[in-house]
């Protein structure tokens, strides 16, 4: 079996397939990995404006989950909502392709930034992440941001910046960050 350390896979030229790529935290992940020079493919259950946006960036997105969608991938990334019975997860495992959780990927990405802010907790994560984003953007630091709600300043729940700062609203699920 291939290495089970996601840090071995987050590198330019590596091929990742994202299951549920149209999701609120998966689409910015796809953009960040694409911007970092990775070859990204993905799948989602339905077409959407988000899926069309990813396609416009040159990221192929299949509609529907089928085992053949993971062909050529070196790793597969999924959300916790995608179970082992999913045909793409089952096909990846059968082919020896490592499967990682979305939060593991964000954790690996964070390590590539000079400044990483990760907001966690029971209540107020979105508000606190929004406030941090406003402050960092006012300081003209051009951060990459992933937030759990739509921030009017961004017009969405994320932005792919060009600076050395990343701000993430994190989830403590599985202690994966």
Predicted regions and their residues:
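N-terminal leader/targeting and accessory segments in enzymes
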Residues: 1-105
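Phosphate-binding loop of NTP-binding sites
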Residues: 32, 55, 69, 80, ...
């Amino acid at each position: 079996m291939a290495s089970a350390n996601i840090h071995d896979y987050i590198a330019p030229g590596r091929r990742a397939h994202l299951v549920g790529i149209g999701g609120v935290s998966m689409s910015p992940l796809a953009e960040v990995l694409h911007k970092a020079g990775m070859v990204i493919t993905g799948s989602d259950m339905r077409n959407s404006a988000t899926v069309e946006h990813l396609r416009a960036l040159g990221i192929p997105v299949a509609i529907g989950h089928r085992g053949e969608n993971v062909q050529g991938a070196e790793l597969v990334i999924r959300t916790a909502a995608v179970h082992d019975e999913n045909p793409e997860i089952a096909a990846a495992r059968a082919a020896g392709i490592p499967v990682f959780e979305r939060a593991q990927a964000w954790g690996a990405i964070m390590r590539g930034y000079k400044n990483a802010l990760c907001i966690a907790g029971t209540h107020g994560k979105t508000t606190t992440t929004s406030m941090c984003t406003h402050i960092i953007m006012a300081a003209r630091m051009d951060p990459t941001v992933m937030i759990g709600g739509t921030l009017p300043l961004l017009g969405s729940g994320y932005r792919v910046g060009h600076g050395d700062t990343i701000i993430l609203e994190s989830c403590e699920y599985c202690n994966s960050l």
